[in-house]
Structures are given as C-alpha cells and as structure tokens.
C-alpha cells in the first residue's frame, strides 16, 4: 500500500521501502531504500524493462535467462546501473544497506503490423 508523502507515494516492503517519484505514459521512477539482507520477490514484467541505479550501498541483481538454469548475477555499487529485459524473471538482494533508483519503461516495435489482406481500390461493378 502506498502512502502519499507530499507528491511522492511511499510503500513499505519487507526489504525496505519504495517511493513512487514519477509515473506517466512513458516510465515509472522509484526511489528505494534497501535493508541489508533484504530480497525482493522473484518476478518478471511481461512488457516493461526494469532498470536499477545504485546511489549508496550494494545490490545484487539476479536474472534468470530463458534457459532457466542460467542465472546472470550483477553486483551494483554506487554509480552502477543495469537493466533487465521484459519477460525475464529477476530478483534483487541488498548486500549492503543503501539507496537505489528503479526505472520501468516499455518499448514497442514501430513495425508491429500483421496484415491479413493487402489494401486495394474497390472497383465499381
């Protein structure tokens, strides 16, 4: 549950807190405070990218590739950034308490059209 704090929505999590700073048609931007040892749920986003930028502390981001046995682990220290593609299970773990920023955005293929027929001019019959 988010609580309004000024213009910012803040929610408590088992691993810390998340503050919704901005949400619009292009992106979501969150400030997260992480507790050492905190781990978020393993989850995926069907359509959204998920980016992580660490301001302080240390965060580990695990990403399960399509071959479920292959797990990529990235250690993020202050100033580091990584992103996760849509459709991949991922999870973060707080190695050292700190603050990070989380971004979500979706992309679309400008050529995402599937034609069943082709255009034509109807003749006068």
Locations of regions flagged by a protein language model:
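Histidine-centered metal-chelating micro-motifs
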Residues: 39-41, 79-91, 109
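Glycine- and acidic-residue-biased ligand/ion/polar-headgroup-sensing regions
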Residues: 47-66
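Short acidic-glycine-tyrosine-enriched beta hairpin
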Residues: 65-87
